[in-house]
A protein has these predicted regions:
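Short loop/turn motifs that connect adjacent beta-strands in outer-membrane beta-barrel proteins
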Residues: 32-42, 55-57, 85-94, 143-166, ...
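Signature for the C-terminal beta-barrel architecture of outer-membrane proteins
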Residues: 196-322, 329-332, 336-343, 350, ...
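Residue-level signature of outer-membrane beta-barrel architecture
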Residues: 86-88, 98, 140-142, 173, ...
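Outer-membrane beta-barrel "beta-signal"
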Residues: 135-147, 375, 444-456
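Transmembrane beta-barrel strands of outer-membrane/channel proteins
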Residues: 48-54, 96-100, 169-173, 230-234, ...
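Outer membrane beta-barrel transmembrane domains
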Residues: 257-259, 274-312, 333, 340, ...
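Hydrophobic, lipid-facing positions within transmembrane beta-strands of outer-membrane proteins
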Residues: 42, 78-82, 132-138, 167, ...
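Surface-exposed coil loops of outer-membrane beta-barrel proteins
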Residues: 111-128, 132, 147-257, 393-404
Length: 456
């Protein structure tokens, strides 16, 4: 880890110098329309989420090691998180998030789907509560004028203000999704959509450990209606593993995102384009399929992929993320991404192409301002190389039914979140999954969920 920290230290200094050189300082004569409150010096916020799910029995003429169990089953996750922060000095903040998590997935293991049904299941490690460090990072802001906007206190955000034009640097232990791929309607599995394809791109194989976090940096440049983000993060030492690969100069995940705000029919919206590129020691499906053909048999582990992890390889993808308000209480969103699909999944899930479109409406429309209703349609696909591997009997990290009658995985999710007081919500959720793990011979699967969420 020392190599990572040394590298990050040099990156921090270099980017700080670049930002200061390129920055346009706020003019002393620039008018300030109001007096702004003193920035909040410290923060301590907490959240608790419990998510219980069950699915009924479904059609399944055959199963293998990584098939979703066709019998009636249930699962749960529980997390308690502290969001602690302090202002080190002007415009510099430090945040620390310890978390306790526990839970058990369907089938006793995280298998059988491309679009998994619970966004918190990667943090669960069984029935014993596990304490771990989720985040530890520094955020530095360089204000660039253009007027100011208020910042309300929130998780990992001290109350205060920021310039509309600014440069923001985040360095340390955090999630790529903390900075990249924002969306007002579909981002948080604790309060919004639960399915993995509902809160980020299903095909976004972003670098992270098995819990979804890593070490690295992200730089944001915000000016007027534009925002540009770039960053580099560490990935797992082995695909979908918990141990981090600290060689961030050799194995890494890079991302670049461009965002433009707009107004359509008098309502705000945003359009984003995100490109990512990962370098890691992973197997190509071509090599893994060749190994299967040379070593025929029935496998219960991703043996072929392990044997084919012979060299470093490049993974990449590009996606579009759009959101558009339809009024003060509702909005729609769209995400679409395509990955290259030539190599095994590195750190997220078994999806090479993803599409999600949805609608969210706030309860103020019917007199319950703290309620919300959401609907999303999702479609996941895999590459022809991954199809051939699975058809040959291959087992990957999350999926593998022994054979494959390929069809895109299709998912619809509907939730209603009922506000209980100001800071608690009870959410009822239904998901229907056709062609689970891209296999038309199995399913459909109906999943019913109840989620409890409180903030303190």
């Amino acid at each position: 880890m020392s190599a990572v920290l040394i590298c990050l230290r040099w990156v921090l200094w270099l980017l700080a110098v670049v930002a200061l050189v390129l920055a346009r300082p706020t003019s002393a004569a620039e008018p300030q329309p109001q007096l702004w409150p003193e920035p909040e010096p410290n923060t301590a916020r907490f959240q608790l989420t419990y998510n219980w799910q069950r699915h009924g029995s479904f059609a399944s003429p055959y199963t293998a090691a990584n098939s979703l169990s066709a019998a009636r089953d249930k699962m749960y996750t529980a997390t308690v998180t502290a969001f602690l922060g302090t202002r080190l000095w002007q415009n510099t903040e430090l945040y620390f998030n310890p978390e306790v998590a526990q839970g058990v997935p369907f089938s006793g293991s995280l298998v059988g789907l491309g679009g998994f049904t619970n966004g918190e299941i990667t943090r669960a490690a069984g029935t014993t509560p596990t304490l771990y460090r989720q985040r530890l990072f520094v955020r530095q802001t360089w204000h660039q004028g253009g007027g100011r906007q208020a910042l309300e206190a929130d998780d990992n955000q001290l109350a205060g203000w920021q310039d509309n034009n600014r440069v923001v640097l985040t360095v340390g232990n955090f999630s790529t999704l903390d900075v990249f791929d924002p969306n007002s309607y579909a981002k948080d599995p604790r309060t919004q959509f639960m399915n993995w394809g509902g809160w980020t791109y299903g095909a976004y194989d972003y670098a992270a450990d098995s819990r979804g976090f890593g070490w690295g940096f992200a730089l944001e440049w915000v000016r007027d209606i534009w925002a540009l983000r770039l960053g580099r993060m560490t990935g797992p030492l082995e695909p979908n593993g918990l141990k981090i690969d600290s060689a961030i100069g050799r194995h890494y995940g890079d991302q670049l995102e461009l965002e433009r705000s707009h107004t359509l029919a008098g309502q705000p919206g945003k359009l984003r384009v995100l490109a990512w590129r990962t370098r890691a020691r992973v197997a190509s499906f071509q090599d893994a399929t060749a190994w299967l053909q040379a070593n025929p048999g029935s496998y219960t582990q991703p043996t072929a992929l392990i044997q084919a992890r012979n060299t470093d390889k490049i993974k990449y993808g590009i996606g579009i993320n759009a959101e558009q308000a339809l009024g003060s209480n509702s909005g729609v969103f769209l995400r679409a991404m395509r990955g290259d699909g030539r190599t095994e999944t590195h750190a997220f899930t078994e999806v090479d192409g993803s599409l999600a479109a949805g609608w969210v409406v706030q309860g103020a429309s019917w007199g319950r301002g703290n309620d919300s209703l959401g609907v999303v349609l999702m479609r996941n696909t895999i590459s022809s190389e991954r199809q051939r591997f699975l058809s040959a009997g291959g087992i990957s990290f999350f999926i593998g039914d022994g054979k494959l009658n390929y069809r895109p995985e299709q998912i619809v999710e509907v939730y209603y979140s009922l506000g209980v007081g100001r800071r608690s919500w009870i959410t009822a959720d239904v998901q229907r999954l056709r062609n689970p793990a891209y296999n038309a011979d199995r399913g459909p699967v109906n999943v019913y969920a109840l989620r409890l969420h409180s903030e303190f």
